Amino acid sequence: MTISKSLALSIFLSLNLLANTNSTAQNTNSKISKKEQVKSSLASYEKYIDDNNDTHLKEFIQLVSIPSISSIPSNKPDVAKAADWIVNKLKAIGMTTAQSIPTDGNPVVYGSWDKAPGKPTVLIYAHYDVQPVKESEWENPPFVPKVIDGKIFGRGASDDKSGVMISIWAVEAMLSKEGKLPLNVKFLFEGEEEIGSPNFKNFLIKNKELLHTDFAVTADDAQYTESVPAITLSSRGAALLEFNVKTANTDAHSGQFGGKTPNAVVAMSQIISSLYDKAGNVAVKGFYDKVLPITAQQKEIIKNIPYDPARDMKILGTTAEVGDTAFSPLERVWYRPTLEIIGMQGGYTAAEGHSNIVPGSAMARITSRLVNNQNGQEIIDLIVKHINKYCPAGATVTYKFKPGYASPMTTPSDTKEFNYVADALLKVYNKQPLKLGTGGTGGAMLSFKEILGVYA
């Protein structure tokens, strides 16, 4: 197994290009000399990656082995352990500063190298927290990473500990071979991205001076394929909600009480069914009211994507698509909002046995993906109003509101920074990078623009 050399080399080249954004015009000979120097450096960095592959693999397995699940309180010590591991790695590669900074939730890892006076500063963002796991659905334990056919299987190996480590290894290679970087670099690794970054905005506000930067890039996005580079320009926001339906103080015996006692699971099913129309569109009144039309630029981005919806259906094993067919599949995933039931629980659900009960309570969790011009609190209010309206007789609903709402984000593609990164990807992959949207959420991205004044 080898790390993504192409991505690492793209980081090398991007840093070199960004380092010269403020340079005055150079003569032709100077430009040629600089170009040859960068080419030589890239070859040197590539050799460094090859020579250190075994070490990097061991390091990566160590980090992925830490169950840094941010949504489960009992895993908080593991999240802190992962943060400390990254801090020690940053110190080992020679960063000027490396520390774990506390927040009201999980710590943020900060590292900097500031020995390039007069040169710009770039801030590289990623996150080290991961999603929870359902271990019964894993062929191998999710926190015992295993290499299969050249790929590492483990929770967080892709999202987003690879982003953390490839960024670090790229800087490590440059410091090892050159003893310096072409510009000043700051690392910012979050520990709460998977729960909507509830404390990240306040962290940026409190540390605005420390985090001052000329550019910001995120290492939390994917390439289109292993051989086709891409730059992600938009992400959806997210709002979360948990609600409980209660029909009785306890589960009841179906032989004694069935037929006259309200069933909480049935009531929950009725509520959930009311959230959608027959085509799968969200039926909550006002849900789509503030959604902006898809722009000509967004349509052009999708037009250039070699996307095959049948491939996704085959991978997932689905037999039909849902949603408004007036929009293409990618338009629905990137530029339209969603309301998903991400989990339900109620009644007797043990793996074996059969308990003859009338369930007295049920629970469901919702994630709503938001698009530009939608507000998370407004959407949650609309959903709550709808649930209250359609809650059947004999049932009551209580709510557990999740902290914070991640806003949608769009990054412009007409900036010099975008052009430098695109040029680096073109040189490394020998292919023009695709412009992508993502249906996922990067809660930190909008805060970068609002507080630090830079796009990421």
Task: Give the predicted meaning of each segment.
Residues M1-K31:
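Bacterial Sec-dependent N-terminal signal peptides
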Residues Q26-P77, I86, I93, S235:
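N-terminal hydrophobic or amphipathic helices/low-complexity stretches enriched
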Residues D50, I61, S65-I69, N88-M95, ...:
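Sec-exported extracytoplasmic/periplasmic mature domains
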Residues E59, I69-K119, F143-K146:
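A non-catalytic alpha/beta surface segment that caps or lines the substrate-entry region
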Residues P117, T225-E226, A283-S361, N372-K385, ...:
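An extended, acidic, His-containing surface patch that forms the Zn2+-binding/catalytic region
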Residues K119-F189:
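Active-site metal-coordination/substrate-binding segment of hydrolases
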Residues S158-S234:
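Acidic/histidine-rich catalytic neighborhood of metal-dependent amide-processing enzymes
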Residues A248, S254-R311:
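Polar, glycine-rich mid-to-C-terminal structural blocks
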